[in-house]
């Protein structure tokens, strides 16, 4: 990992779809704004048996979450459904380093270029939206082996560095202002959703309070 200002306030966000590396590319390009993976499964039921998660990544992140809960007070931990709803949670913060553990880079897709204005932030472009508002000091994307890299222009303009999830050191993230854990149900088969709820359950047991998924 390259040089960075470890004193800069940080947002660490984890998208649950990071555990779907073994199968997400089977349906990745079939999911539009209104069509989640479970709608695809309804049309093609046998697909569900091919949609597996990487349980090694799940287990590793679960261990890291327990360590993070020990570092952070409950008021710095949030669970959300859609990744772009993170925007409301960071409105009160100054510029920050953004660490995004995610199968997708969320800088923008299709014909998005550095000059494209994001009029409506959504799950695939919220990082660019924040950066264009001058809210991000550095963007560090923690991805899978088979994650699609952003186009060259977007990479140079927005991404400080991509890091493979298998090489990322969670302890390197200092001064975490908020830990935001995202469900992204449109990317997760229903039979795997229970694993996300286990993260919520661990947080609730540790902090002794209920967490809403907003």
Report each predicted region and the residues it spans.
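Conserved alpha-helical scaffold segments that buttress catalytic/binding sites
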Residues: 2-214
């Amino acid at each position: 990992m390259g040089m960075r200002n470890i004193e800069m306030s940080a947002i660490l966000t984890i998208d649950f779809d990071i555990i779907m590396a073994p199968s997400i590319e089977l349906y990745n390009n079939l999911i539009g704004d209104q069509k989640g993976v479970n709608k695809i499964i309804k049309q093609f039921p046998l697909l569900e048996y091919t949609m597996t998660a990487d349980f090694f990544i799940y287990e590793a992140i679960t261990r890291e979450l327990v360590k993070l809960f020990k570092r952070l007070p409950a008021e710095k931990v949030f669970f959300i459904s859609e990744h772009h709803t993170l925007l409301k949670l960071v409105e009160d913060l100054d510029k920050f380093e953004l660490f995004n553990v995610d199968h997708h880079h969320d800088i923008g897709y299709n014909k998005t270029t550095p000059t494209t204005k994001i009029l409506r932030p959504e799950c695939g472009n919220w990082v660019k939206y924040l950066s264009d508002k001058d809210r991000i000091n550095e963007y560090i994307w923690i991805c899978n082996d088979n994650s699609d890299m952003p186009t060259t222009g977007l990479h140079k303009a927005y991404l400080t560095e991509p890091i493979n999830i298998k090489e990322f050191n969670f302890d390197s993230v200092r001064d975490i202002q908020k830990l935001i854990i995202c469900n992204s149900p449109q990317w997760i088969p229903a039979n795997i959703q229970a694993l996300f709820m286990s993260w919520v359950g661990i947080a609730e047991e540790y902090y002794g309070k209920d967490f809403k998924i907003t």
